[in-house]
């Protein structure tokens, strides 16, 4: 839905190439950071005769919280070198924002799974749809409304808007959407935070989930490898992003 807008309002095809590349990385990292635990959660929480459901929820929730936090700390500690190696040395904040987004999204997959387990279909669908619409609205605001306001009433938005930031606002919109989604899930997260972690159950879930992680990596890498590896095929980073932008837009539309 956002592709036509991106291809129309972003400064050049290279900007959409950046979006395509970073969201390719995000999809792969999301599989790595959930490491099959969503499936493991459903497998064990439904064994009520053997496991206490809330202990299963707490164990998986704390495990994802810990791994997501460690990932975030590692990325931010190595942010300059990671950004430079991926070709974003001039904008390390892109990598920082995407790392935060994927860490929170990985953690939130378990509260969403808990909603499905509890049969709260309306709440599950409502938060998901709100996140989608909010992301669309924020993209329209930053990429269409703000440039218009800057052209006609610059003093109204000069305190927060940078007209030269361009594609960065795609990631800013996603950050806001992710944080609001997390806040909406707090009532569903708290029961798991208050419950006790069962180390024995957690080990069983991890053993069960590991093969799912391997299959997940294989599946998602098959879908995203082209977007991830594309920039490394060219010596000229700017040209690579331009070509990836064209390829990524055609891929989405097709």
Model-derived features with residue positions:
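Transmembrane-helix boundary and interhelical linker motifs in polytopic inner-membrane proteins
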Residues: 7, 11-15, 29-63, 83, ...
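Membrane-interface junctions at transmembrane-helix termini in multi-pass inner-membrane proteins
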Residues: 44, 104-128, 189, 193
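Interhelical loop/hinge segments that connect adjacent transmembrane helices in multipass membrane
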Residues: 150-169, 182-223
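Small-residue-rich midsections of specific transmembrane alpha-helices
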Residues: 2, 20-45, 100-110, 216-225, ...
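Short membrane-interface helical motifs at transmembrane helix boundaries
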Residues: 3-7, 70-89, 146-158
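Alpha-helical transmembrane segments of multi-pass membrane proteins
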Residues: 28-29, 65, 69, 73, ...
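Helix-terminus/linker motif at the lipid-water interface of multi-pass membrane proteins
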Residues: 1-15, 83-84, 220-254
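Membrane-interface helix-loop junctions in multi-pass transport and translocation proteins
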Residues: 8-15, 118-126, 130-182, 240
